[in-house]
A protein has these predicted regions:
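C-terminal and inter-domain tail/linker signature
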Residues: 1-176
């Protein structure tokens, strides 16, 4: 691990806020318009809010198919909702104050064929819990990521998540 933070890290609050505000529009255009049937944009926003920010893990069963297939950072691959729940809980244990914001949602598809989605997000938190990144350091971290989902029948059946885990580890190590 790095002995010091790379140039530009940690970002100051003004830079971070400017980057977060660069997503436009801040709310989805369709939010003002009622959508008949399944609203994929609202579904994804509810998922991220309920699971990542409110930590209502019971809702995972509403959003995900039990046989979920997942691929994520550092070549994580597994099948089954219970493995996904373990992964989410391990991140939340490591970063108990993690707050996630959706920057953009892109999607294509329909109710018959299903949807392919891409959600660009950012998060801030403190590495203050036990976890896979070593002893807690109380390091403030900033994470940028993309989560892609395949949604069929109102359930997420495949998820691909990407964030720079090496950058995250560098932020944690730089505060030591």
């Amino acid at each position: 691990l790095a002995t010091s933070a790379p140039q530009g890290w940690p970002r100051d609050h003004k830079t971070w806020d400017d980057l977060r505000r660069s997503a436009s529009p801040e709310i989805p255009i369709c939010e003002a318009d009622l959508i008949e049937g399944f609203d994929i944009d609202r579904f994804l926003r509810n998922f991220f809010e309920k699971i990542w920010n409110q930590r209502d893990y019971r809702k995972l069963y509403e959003f995900f198919d039990y046989n979920l297939h997942f691929e994520g950072p550092t070549n994580r691959k597994f099948s089954g909702l219970e493995h996904y729940i373990h992964f989410i809980r391990s991140l939340m244990t490591s970063f108990p104050d993690l707050e996630l914001q959706i920057n953009e949602i892109y999607w294509m598809g329909n109710d018959v064929d299903g949807y392919l989605t891409s959600t660009r997000w950012s998060a801030t938190g403190t590495y203050s819990g036990e976890g896979i990144y070593g002893e807690p350091t109380d390091s403030k971290v900033q994470i940028w990521g993309i989560t892609q989902n395949q949604v069929v029948g109102g359930k997420i059946v495949n998820e691909w998540m990407l964030f720079n885990e090496m950058d995250l580890m560098m932020q944690i190590a730089a505060s030591n």
